[in-house]
Curated annotation (Swiss-Prot):
The gene is E1. It comes from Human papillomavirus 65. Residues 573-598 are annotated as: Disordered. ATP-dependent DNA 3'-5' helicase required for initiation of viral DNA replication. It forms a complex with the viral E2 protein. The E1-E2 complex binds to the replication origin which contains binding sites for both proteins. During the initial step, a dimer of E1 interacts with a dimer of protein E2 leading to a complex that binds the viral origin of replication with high specificity. Then, a second dimer of E1 displaces the E2 dimer in an ATP-dependent manner to form the E1 tetramer. This is Replication protein E1. Belongs to the papillomaviridae E1 protein family. One of its GO terms (molecular function) is DNA binding. SUPFAM superfamilies: Origin of replication-binding domain, RBD-like, P-loop containing nucleoside triphosphate hydrolases. Keywords: ATP-binding, DNA replication, DNA-binding, Early protein, Helicase, Host nucleus, Hydrolase, Isomerase, Isopeptide bond, Nucleotide-binding, Phosphoprotein, Ubl conjugation. Phosphorylated. Residues 401-551 form the SF3 helicase domain. Its EC number is 5.6.2.4. A motif (Nuclear export signal) lies at residues 90-99.
């Protein structure tokens, strides 16, 4: 076994920097002696006390709690939006700073103001902060609600909650929302908060000049109004009116139109009107009366639409055009149950077209079944005005036309005698030819045809539905066309007319009135028309008054007086004489049951 100890290797010349063993000294034996003999002035430099354990567990719990709080705050900041009011309190300029621009949903870009209330879930994150110390020292007792409205971040939610507590119904259940302040309505529900009682009482009188119906219920310093204005108003106009009248601000007002088709809404206001604390002025609005009042009409309400009733109504009112029937029958829905059922129908266009077709058929048959005398007296009966026939006589005399000659030609014209079935009035321009003829055709409910439509196969079709036809300002080309194609039309004999959507119709054309600047009988190229027309010349220009109106005017009342005065000379027979005094039965196209009574 090798010897214990340190083995040294002798290296020449290295003894001066290689230390092989520590040198022992006996001058200082212990650490205490070293400290005692030190020349340092610092006492107790080394802490030699016993080390304590301490409360390390509490320190650990505090650190874990801080870490959890920071993690929860990070999650809240990530998933919860900061309240808008808090941002505004930090800085007004900071509220306007937005990193991401706001974008509206595409499905709402073109949404109209339909009045349908949207879901309120989108506003559910809005925080409502209220001050617990509000209005405790108010002298008038109503300052608490005003201060509350000013201090809350969502004023509308606070106002809706107060309204439901005071009036026992939700505001959104009795109103429909207008998104735009420009939308107009006749009826408005208005809720006022924090207004003087004296001003609220005086508004009952002031509003009467603006409204046809007023219902006011005052509760403390608030009031509920149901108003029907004389003319439609927007929300802006209503707010300005109430603010100026009650001396309040716009944030103290809730205003929206009521739900006009809601039965609970109508019943609510109907019940409020019967309370003693409610003030009512005017007649109950129609939308409330229809849904609350019982009438005899409810027993006869039509479950389905009946076309025959619509046809009978259009026939009685002498409505033939589709636009007239559609518009006036829609307005009739307030009075007639069948018209109301028509508005609910999805086939309104078809019903209007069918109604117009049926009325035209009935009217066409009646016209064809009447003689010319009966038709003229029928036109006279429909004219309710009274006039004088002398302007016609004076105008003919002014134009140099013998009144007796005119009556003889007109008598043959009205009878439709062949070869005497057409009257031509010719002369220079501005002589009153068209004015004279148009007034006569209008009174007799005649039809006008134009040569410009000659290229159409159906340009003579209007002559099938009239007693008198009229063609204005016939040129030489037009006379040439008549000479080549329409000689038998002027004869007064039956001819074939092409009708649209029907087979060609064979009938006798009605008597024709034609105005022209050409004297047909002076044109030898139109010699075959000389025997088919009766001509009158109007050589003198129509005189005018200082205001620009013609001196001679011809109205329906003028022609009514003319035919009544000269009916015997024209050999017109009175329909009462033909029927021997027996009244004719009115036309009816609806079926009536035995239980119907009026």
């Amino acid at each position: 076994m090798a010897d214990k100890g340190t083995e040294n290797f002798d290296l020449e010349g290295s003894s001066w920097y290689i230390v092989h063993e520590a040198e022992c000294t006996d001058s200082i034996d212990t650490l205490e002696d070293l400290c005692d003999e030190s020349d340092s002035n610092v006492s107790n430099l080394i802490d030699d006390d016993v080390v304590d354990q301490g409360n390390s567990l509490a320190l650990y719990n505090a650190k874990i709690t801080d870490d959890c709080d920071n993690a929860i705050a990070h999650l809240k900041r990530k998933y919860n939006k900061s309240p808008e009011q808090a941002v505004a309190e930090l800085s007004p300029q900071l509220q306007a700073v937005k990193i991401t621009p706001e974008r509206n949903s595409k499905r709402r870009l073109f949404q109209e103001d339909s009045g349908i209330f949207e879901d309120e879930a989108e506003n559910s994150l809005t925080q409502v902060e209220s001050n617990s110390q509000t209005g405790g020292n108010s002298q008038d007792g109503g300052g608490d609600i005003n201060l509350l409205l000013l201090q809350t971040s969502n004023r509308r939610a606070t106002m809706l909650a107060k309204f439901k507590d005071w009036y026992g119904v939700s505001y959104n259940e009795i109103t429909r929302v207008y998104k735009s302040d420009k939308s107009c309505s006749d009826n408005w529900v208005i809720v006022i908060f924090r207004a003087a009682v004296e001003v609220l009482e005086s508004s009952k009188i002031v509003l009467q000049q603006h409204c046809t119906y007023i219902q006011v219920k005052i509760f403390g310093f608030s009031a509920l109004y149901l108003l029907q204005f004389k003319s439609a108003k927007s929300r802006e106009t209503v707010q300005k009116l109430m603010c100026s009248m009650l001396n309040i601000q716009e944030f103290q007002i809730l205003t929206d139109p009521p739900k006009l088709r809601s039965v609970p809404t109508a019943l609510y206001f109907y019940k409020q009107a019967m309370l003693t604390e409610s003030f009512v002025f005017g007649q109950t609005p129609d939308w409330i009366a229809k849904q609350t009042l019982v009438s005899h009409q409810a027993a006869t309400t039509a479950e389905t639409f009946e076309l025959s009733k619509m046809v009978q109504w259009a026939y009685d009112n002498n409505l033939l055009e589709e636009c007239d029937i559609a518009y006036h029958y829609a307005m009739y829905a307030d009075e007639d149950a069948n018209a109301a059922a028509y508005l609910k129908s999805n086939n309104q266009v078809k019903h209007v077209r069918d109604c117009s077709t049926m009325v035209r058929m009935y009217k066409r048959y009646e016209m064809r079944d009447m003689s010319m005398s009966e038709w003229i007296y029928k036109c006279c009966d429909e004219c309710t005005e009274e006039g004088d026939w002398k302007p016609i006589s004076q105008f003919l005399k002014y134009q140099g036309v013998n009144i007796l000659s005119f009556l003889i030609v007109l008598k043959s014209f009205l009878k439709g005698i062949p070869k005497k079935n057409c009257i031509v009035i010719h002369g220079p321009p501005d002589t009153g030819k068209s004015l004279f003829c148009y007034s006569l055709v209008k009174f007799l409910k005649g039809k006008v045809v134009s040569y410009v439509n000659r290229s159409s196969h159906f340009w003579l079709q209007p002559l099938m539905d009239c007693k008198v036809g009229f063609m204005d300002d016939a040129t030489y080309v037009c006379w040439t066309y008549i000479d080549q194609n329409l000689r038998n039309a002027l004869d007064g004999n039956p001819m074939c007319i092409d009708a649209k959507h029907r087979a060609p119709q064979q009938l006798k054309l009605p008597p024709m009135l034609i105005t022209s600047n050409i004297d047909v009988k002076q044109e030898q190229s139109l010699m075959y028309l000389h025997s088919r027309v009766q001509c009158f010349s109007f050589p003198n220009k129509m005189p005018f008054l200082d205001d620009g109106s013609p001196m001679y005017t011809f109205t329906d009342a003028t022609w009514k007086s003319f035919f009544q005065k000269l009916g015997r000379q024209l050999e017109l027979t009175d329909p009462e004489e033909e029927s021997n005094g027996v009244p004719s039965r009115a036309f009816r196209c609806t079926s009536r049951s035995n239980s119907d009574s009026y």
